[in-house]
Curated annotation (Swiss-Prot):
E.C. no: 6.3.3.1
Keyword Chloroplast listed: no
Molecular functions (GO terms): ATP binding; phosphoribosylamine-glycine ligase activity; phosphoribosylformylglycinamidine cyclo-ligase activity
A Pfam family recorded for this sequence: AIRS
Gene assigned in the entry: purM
InterPro entries membership: PurM-like_C_dom, PurM-like_C_sf, PurM-like_N, PurM-like_N_sf, PurM_cligase
Protein name (database record): Phosphoribosylformylglycinamidine cyclo-ligase
Keyword annotations of the record: ATP-binding, Cytoplasm, Ligase, Nucleotide-binding, Purine biosynthesis
Pathway: Purine metabolism; IMP biosynthesis via de novo pathway; 5-amino-1-(5-phospho-D-ribosyl)imidazole from N(2)-formyl-N(1)-(5-phospho-D-ribosyl)glycinamide: step 2/2
Species of origin: Neisseria meningitidis serogroup B (strain ATCC BAA-335 / MC58)
């Protein structure tokens, strides 16, 4: 007679999954909003739209962390990639004026390492808490044979809400409007395939002091900056005509996504100093300047476009909220079919 098999024998540990849920409950609880009905653990999560909205529009976004995760595996650094995961989605929906309401995560692995997964999801909860977004649920998928030992993948899903009349589309952007840039916290979650290639080829001392007391390793793995609370504070007082979250495609490919076809964002390359991380990447990888602008955020994580008469006040308010804000340039008329972001 053959030996009796269990799910654990097949590589799936239900007890480990249950332990992870218990571990993350306190973190998730701290993120809750009054709109959330019920607790973690149900088949679905219930969220009501607040009565303060007359004509609410839901805005959704989904994203991952990309190959930055490979560095997390190699360096055994798992406590900040969850922040990256949240930031990539909530910053995206923020661009349309949405206040993030709730977030769900998907964590997939070959064998569940409970302490490591706890670190990851603790970071997700931290990102949610910092952006005022409720972590209402998720999926932990233990799939034997699907991932190498010690590796996992992440996906995140954010939903926010905005009054219909306040949806930011970029359609009102016009000639003479001012382009502001909010400083990034490093490479955020994009360009890491190139970063890893540069590190592999250059073989730098990752633990030597690199910038302002940080090592190169710390500079490379630094989490994506969350812009939610400062931008929402600005939206309470001013009209923001358009925003661009600078992600894959860098500055030159993301800003046009919010511009009317007859306009160009003319950005002065001297209006901000290229942070040391990007200086090193460009030099070590011998990366051409235009390739830098279309691959990395180059120190600008969010672009905000406002009327000229509001620019000083918006810049000041965002500065009071803790952001470093640069006046990058102006919106001008487009000539022919020229690219809609010009950095010079």
């Amino acid at each position: 007679m053959s030996t009796s098999l269990s799910y654990r024998d097949a590589g799936v540990d239900i007890d480990a999954g249950d332990q992870l849920v218990e571990n993350i409950k306190p973190f998730a609880k701290r993120t809750m909003r009054p709109e959330v009905l019920g607790d973690l653990g149900g088949f679905g999560a219930l969220v009501e739209i607040g009565k303060k909205y007359q004509n609410p529009v839901l805005v959704s976004g989904t994203d991952g962390v990309g190959t930055k995760l490979k560095l997390a595996f190699d360096w055994d650094k798992h406590d900040t990639v969850g922040i990256d995961l949240v930031a990539m989605s909530v910053n995206d929906i923020l661009v349309q004026g949405a206040e993030p309401l709730f977030f769900l995560d998907y964590f997939a692995c070959g064998k569940l390492d409970v302490p490591r997964a706890t670190d990851v999801i603790k970071g997700i909860a931290q990102g949610c808490e910092e952006s005022g977004c409720a972590l209402i649920g998720g999926e932990t998928a233990e799939m034997p044979g699907m991932y190498p030992v010690g590796e996992y993948d992440l996906a995140g899903f954010a939903v926010g809400v905005v009054e219909k009349e306040n949806v930011i589309t970029g359609r009102s952007i016009g000639v003479g409007d001012v382009v502001l840039g909010l400083a990034s916290n490093g490479a955020h979650s994009n360009g890491y395939s190139l970063i890893r290639k540069i590190i592999e080829r250059d073989n730098p001392d990752l633990d030597a002091e690199f910038d302002n007391g940080k090592t190169l390793r710390e500079a490379v793995i630094a989490p994506t900056r969350l812009y939610v609370k400062p931008i929402l504070a600005a939206l309470e007082k001013f009209t923001i005509k358009g925003m661009a979250h600078i992600t894959g495609g860098g500055i030159t490919e993301n800003v046009p996504r919010v511009l009317p076809e007859n306009t160009v964002a003319q950005i002065d390359a001297k209006s901000w100093e290229l942070p040391k991380l990007f200086q090193w990447l460009q030099k070590a990888g011998n990366v051409e300047t235009q390739e830098m602008y279309r691959t990395f955020n180059c120190g600008i994580g969010m672009v905000v476009i406002v009327a000229a008469e509001d620019a000083d006040a918006v810049q000041g308010l965002l500065g009071e909220q803790g952001e470093t804000v640069y006046r990058l340039g102006l919106i001008r008329e487009r000539q022919g079919d020229e690219h809609q972001t010009q950095v010079a």
